[in-house]
Amino acid sequence: MVVLAASFIVAAPSPAGAYSYGDPDKEDVAETYKLIEAELAENDWDAALAAYQVRRAEIESHFGKDVALTLDANFRDKNKALVLQNYRYILYMNLDRRFTYAEQNINNYAQASLLLAKAKGTFDVLKPYLEIRIPNQIQEIRDHFDKAYESLGNPGLFNLGKKPVDVEAYRRHTSAILTTLKPLFAYTPA
């Protein structure tokens, strides 16, 4: 009886396990790009479209109805090059969005660092594409991410190790990332 009760307690779902905030440096929109790219490499348009449709409402909400309609048309036309090109442009816009929201929350260390981690997750998904186009600048971009993160300061623990926020440094480093990447991302509306 004791064994049965103990096994029930172990097998019972824990309230702590009911909530999952995911990996802080993973960006769902970017992770979906990887799925779409892999499915299109196999010419599995149904699976690629299904992956896109999971994120479509989010894409429309963050990047506009026209962007979502463009991707809808790219999928309908089965234009692999435009699906990937326009989705990569969404990821570039997502970097900008995350940088902007991190700056707006720059005095909230936890929130700003989470948003910057999401931006870094987007960059990591784009890295294979970027390594072909700008291999000599990847480390420079990583350095800018590190310095942008450092510019968020550090609230310290009981004021030990506390460092102030440097908004200008944050802007300088995130702007350098966006400026370097912008020429590599084109958008072709439907």
Region spans (language model):
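Bacterial N-terminal signal peptides
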Residues: 2-11
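Bacterial Sec-dependent signal peptides at the C-terminal "C-region" and cleavage site
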Residues: 11-17
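Mature extracytoplasmic or organellar-lumen-exposed domains after removal of signal/transit peptides
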Residues: 17-190
